[in-house]
Amino acid sequence: MIIIVTGGAGFIGSNFIFHMLRKYPDYRIACLDKLTYAGNLSTLAPVMDNPNFRFVKLDICDREGVYRLFEEEHPDMVVNFAAESHVDRSIENPEVFLQTNILGTQVLMDACRKYGIRRYHQVSTDEVYGDLPLDRPDLFFTEETPIHTSSPYSASKASADLLVLAYHRTYGLPVTISRCSNNYGPYHFPEKLIPLMIANALNNKPLPVYGTGENVRDWLYVEDHCKAIDLILHNGRVGEVYNIGGHNEMRNIDIVKIICKALGKPESLITYVTDRKGHDMRYAIDPTKIHRELGWLPETKFADGIQKTIEWYLDNREWWETIISGEYRDYYEKMYGNR
C-alpha cells in the first residue's frame, strides 16, 4: 500500500505518519509539505531513516510537481492534511487560505482523477458547522448539521469539502471526509491554545485569553484522531462524511487554569485580551456515526491526554523554543502585544 500524505510535516499529519508506519510497517508513505511557518521538518526526524518513508518539499498548489509525484509513487490512497489552519491568520490574510485550502485541494483531486486511486481522504474541521449556543448543552454537530461558517478559515475548509463531494458525484472519485474537533498532543504548533499556554507558562510569560475565556471546545487527543482516520481509510463508506469528536468539552479558561496548576504557575499570569472577531462560542461533535459504522471511540481522557502533552513539551523544549525564537515571535507580538 502506497499513501501520499500532504501536510505531513505539520501537527496532525506528522502524528498520522508515525501512527501508520508503526501499525503498517510494510506500507510506503510519501509525505509532501510546503514547509510554511507551521511545517517543521525536524518533526519528521523519527521516520526520516525509514526506508518506507519519503519526504518531498512541495506546495499542493504546484500542479506540475504534484503530478510528477503521483507518476513516481503511483499511490493507492491520498490523505490531505495540507491546510492553512489558524483562524487569526485567516482574518489577517484570507487569500492564502483560499489558495491552499480550496485550489490546492482541487489540484490533488485532479491528480487522483488523472492517475487513479483507491481512496482520497479530506481532513476537515468541525468549524464548518459554525458554533452552538452555550445555553444548549444538549445540541451537538452531526453530519447532517448545515454548513454555517464564521471565519475565512472555516469558509475555505467548507468550500474544499463541497468540492470533494462534487468530484465524487461528478467524476466518481472515491472520497471520504472527516470533520474533527480541536486536537491536542505532541508537535502542536505554539500558536494554538494549549501549546501556547504551556510554552508561555514555562517561560513565565503572560497567558493571553480571548474575551472572558468562556468559549467551549471539544478536545480530541491527536492519536485518537489518527486512529479514526485510519479506520475511515480502510473501512469507511465512499462518499461519506464522518464526524470525529473527543467527548471532552472544556471552557478555554478552564484549560488554561489546568495548565497553570500542572506546571505550578500562578493564575495571575492569565491576561484577558480583546476577543477574536466572530469568535465561535461552542463546538461539540456527535461521533455516533463513526462509532456505529466503524467501532471508533476516543480512548484518551482529557486528564490523561493533557498530562502526556505537558510532559512532551517539558521533554522537547528545543523543538518548540526554536519555533518561538523565529518568525513566530513577530506574529505573536502582532496578535497579542497591543490587546
Regions found by a protein language model. Name each.
Residues 1-183, 308, 313-316, 322-339:
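N-terminal Rossmann-like NAD(P)+-binding domain of SDR-like oxidoreductases, especially those catalyzing
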